[in-house]
Amino acid sequence: NLLTYNSGGAKVFKKNYIESINNIENVGCEKTFYILTNETRKNNNEYVKFLKIPHIFENIFFLPFTYFVVIPFLIRKYKINKIVNFCDIPIFTKIYQIFYFDWPYAVYPESVVWKKMGAYDKIYRSSKLFLFKNLINNCNLIIAQSQVISDRLKKLYDFQNVKVIKMG
Protein backbone atom coordinates (compact mmCIF):
# COMPACT_ATOMS: atom_id res chain seq x y z
CA ASN A 1 0.00 0.00 0.00
CA LEU A 2 1.63 3.21 -1.23
CA LEU A 3 -1.58 5.20 -1.51
CA THR A 4 -0.64 8.29 0.52
CA TYR A 5 3.14 8.12 0.18
CA ASN A 6 3.40 11.38 -1.77
CA SER A 7 5.75 13.94 -0.22
CA GLY A 8 9.34 14.46 0.87
CA GLY A 9 11.56 11.42 1.27
CA ALA A 10 8.51 9.16 1.05
CA LYS A 11 7.95 10.24 -2.55
CA VAL A 12 11.53 9.28 -3.49
CA PHE A 13 11.20 5.95 -1.65
CA LYS A 14 7.90 5.25 -3.43
CA LYS A 15 9.45 5.96 -6.85
CA ASN A 16 12.48 3.73 -6.17
CA TYR A 17 10.36 0.94 -4.67
CA ILE A 18 7.97 0.90 -7.62
CA GLU A 19 10.82 0.92 -10.14
CA SER A 20 12.58 -1.93 -8.32
CA ILE A 21 9.56 -4.18 -7.90
CA ASN A 22 8.30 -3.41 -11.39
CA ASN A 23 11.53 -4.89 -12.81
CA ILE A 24 10.92 -8.33 -11.32
CA GLU A 25 11.60 -10.92 -13.97
CA ASN A 26 11.25 -14.19 -12.09
CA VAL A 27 10.23 -16.83 -14.61
CA GLY A 28 8.01 -19.39 -12.95
CA CYS A 29 7.11 -17.07 -10.07
CA GLU A 30 3.75 -18.05 -8.63
CA LYS A 31 3.21 -14.79 -6.77
CA THR A 32 1.79 -11.56 -8.03
CA PHE A 33 2.68 -8.29 -6.31
CA TYR A 34 -0.19 -5.81 -6.20
CA ILE A 35 0.82 -2.19 -5.65
CA LEU A 36 -1.91 0.12 -4.38
CA THR A 37 -1.18 3.66 -5.54
CA ASN A 38 -2.87 6.86 -6.67
CA GLU A 39 -0.74 7.10 -9.81
CA THR A 40 -1.39 5.58 -13.19
CA ARG A 41 1.32 3.01 -13.84
CA LYS A 42 1.91 0.55 -16.62
CA ASN A 43 2.13 -3.11 -15.64
CA ASN A 44 5.49 -4.18 -17.03
CA ASN A 45 5.01 -7.89 -16.44
CA GLU A 46 2.66 -10.56 -15.14
CA TYR A 47 4.10 -10.48 -11.61
CA VAL A 48 3.42 -6.85 -10.75
CA LYS A 49 -0.03 -5.29 -11.01
CA PHE A 50 -0.77 -1.67 -10.15
CA LEU A 51 -4.16 -0.96 -8.62
CA LYS A 52 -4.95 2.73 -9.09
CA ILE A 53 -7.11 4.37 -6.46
CA PRO A 54 -8.60 7.77 -7.41
CA HIS A 55 -7.21 10.75 -5.48
CA ILE A 56 -10.67 11.42 -4.00
CA PHE A 57 -10.16 8.48 -1.64
CA GLU A 58 -7.27 10.34 0.02
CA ASN A 59 -9.64 13.17 0.94
CA ILE A 60 -10.18 13.65 4.67
CA PHE A 61 -13.88 12.83 4.34
CA PHE A 62 -13.23 9.60 2.44
CA LEU A 63 -10.35 8.21 4.53
CA PRO A 64 -12.58 6.02 6.73
CA PHE A 65 -14.39 4.70 3.64
CA THR A 66 -11.05 4.06 1.93
CA TYR A 67 -9.52 2.10 4.82
CA PHE A 68 -12.67 0.26 5.94
CA VAL A 69 -14.34 -0.46 2.58
CA VAL A 70 -12.30 0.25 -0.58
CA ILE A 71 -8.99 -1.35 0.37
CA PRO A 72 -10.58 -4.41 2.09
CA PHE A 73 -12.70 -4.89 -1.06
CA LEU A 74 -9.55 -4.91 -3.23
CA ILE A 75 -7.88 -7.37 -0.86
CA ARG A 76 -10.79 -9.79 -1.29
CA LYS A 77 -11.16 -9.19 -5.03
CA TYR A 78 -7.50 -9.93 -5.78
CA LYS A 79 -7.14 -12.62 -3.09
CA ILE A 80 -4.23 -10.82 -1.48
CA ASN A 81 -2.74 -12.86 1.36
CA LYS A 82 -0.02 -10.55 2.73
CA ILE A 83 0.29 -6.78 2.94
CA VAL A 84 3.24 -4.45 3.27
CA ASN A 85 1.74 -1.10 4.18
CA PHE A 86 3.83 2.08 3.81
CA CYS A 87 1.00 4.52 4.55
CA ASP A 88 0.18 6.34 7.78
CA ILE A 89 -2.91 4.25 8.50
CA PRO A 90 -3.19 0.48 9.00
CA ILE A 91 -5.72 -1.34 6.82
CA PHE A 92 -8.87 -2.89 8.25
CA THR A 93 -8.15 -6.54 7.47
CA LYS A 94 -7.35 -9.89 9.04
CA ILE A 95 -4.72 -10.54 6.34
CA TYR A 96 -1.11 -10.59 7.59
CA GLN A 97 -0.04 -6.94 7.56
CA ILE A 98 3.45 -5.53 7.98
CA PHE A 99 3.15 -1.83 8.72
CA TYR A 100 6.06 0.52 8.09
CA PHE A 101 5.67 3.32 10.63
CA ASP A 102 7.09 6.76 9.84
CA TRP A 103 4.40 9.20 10.97
CA PRO A 104 5.70 11.05 14.07
CA TYR A 105 2.37 12.77 14.80
CA ALA A 106 1.01 9.44 16.07
CA VAL A 107 3.76 8.96 18.65
CA TYR A 108 3.94 12.59 19.78
CA PRO A 109 0.27 13.49 20.37
CA GLU A 110 1.31 15.90 23.15
CA SER A 111 3.71 17.84 20.90
CA VAL A 112 3.43 21.61 20.62
CA VAL A 113 3.23 21.08 16.85
CA TRP A 114 -0.41 20.00 17.26
CA LYS A 115 -1.25 23.36 18.86
CA LYS A 116 0.40 25.33 16.05
CA MET A 117 -1.43 23.61 13.19
CA GLY A 118 -4.02 25.36 11.11
CA ALA A 119 -7.62 24.12 11.31
CA TYR A 120 -7.53 21.97 8.16
CA ASP A 121 -4.21 20.30 9.07
CA LYS A 122 -5.40 19.64 12.60
CA ILE A 123 -8.68 18.09 11.42
CA TYR A 124 -6.88 16.03 8.76
CA ARG A 125 -4.17 14.74 11.11
CA SER A 126 -6.64 14.17 13.96
CA SER A 127 -8.76 12.06 11.60
CA LYS A 128 -5.72 10.04 10.56
CA LEU A 129 -4.71 9.63 14.21
CA PHE A 130 -8.21 8.40 15.09
CA LEU A 131 -8.01 5.81 12.31
CA PHE A 132 -4.47 4.83 13.30
CA LYS A 133 -5.51 4.25 16.93
CA ASN A 134 -8.50 2.17 15.89
CA LEU A 135 -6.72 0.12 13.23
CA ILE A 136 -3.28 -0.51 14.75
CA ASN A 137 -4.37 -3.91 16.09
CA ASN A 138 -4.94 -5.07 12.50
CA CYS A 139 -1.15 -5.07 12.10
CA ASN A 140 0.89 -8.20 12.74
CA LEU A 141 4.24 -6.43 12.72
CA ILE A 142 5.25 -2.79 12.83
CA ILE A 143 8.62 -1.65 11.54
CA ALA A 144 9.98 1.49 13.19
CA GLN A 145 13.07 3.51 12.27
CA SER A 146 14.41 3.97 15.80
CA GLN A 147 14.24 2.45 19.26
CA VAL A 148 12.64 5.66 20.58
CA ILE A 149 9.76 5.34 18.11
CA SER A 150 9.44 1.63 18.89
CA ASP A 151 9.25 2.35 22.62
CA ARG A 152 6.63 5.07 22.12
CA LEU A 153 4.47 2.80 19.94
CA LYS A 154 4.62 0.10 22.61
CA LYS A 155 3.81 2.53 25.41
CA LEU A 156 1.09 4.63 23.73
CA TYR A 157 -0.71 1.87 21.85
CA ASP A 158 0.25 -1.26 23.78
CA PHE A 159 1.44 -2.83 20.54
CA GLN A 160 4.39 -5.06 21.34
CA ASN A 161 5.45 -6.57 18.00
CA VAL A 162 7.60 -3.67 16.82
CA LYS A 163 10.94 -4.24 15.13
CA VAL A 164 13.53 -1.53 14.53
CA ILE A 165 15.11 -1.24 11.10
CA LYS A 166 17.27 1.85 10.83
CA MET A 167 16.91 3.71 7.56
CA GLY A 168 19.52 6.04 6.16
Residue ranges and their predicted role:
Residues 98-126:
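Acceptor-binding helix/loop patch of EC 2.4 sugar-transfer enzymes
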Residues 40-41, 90, 148-150:
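Alpha-helix capping/helix-boundary segments
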Residues 2-16:
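A short, glycine/small-residue-rich beta-strand->loop->alpha-helix junction that serves as a flexible
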Residues 14-20, 24-86:
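Active-site donor-binding segments of glycosyltransferases and PAPS-dependent sulfotransferases
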Residues 150-168:
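Helix-loop-beta element that forms the nucleotide-linked donor phosphate-binding surface
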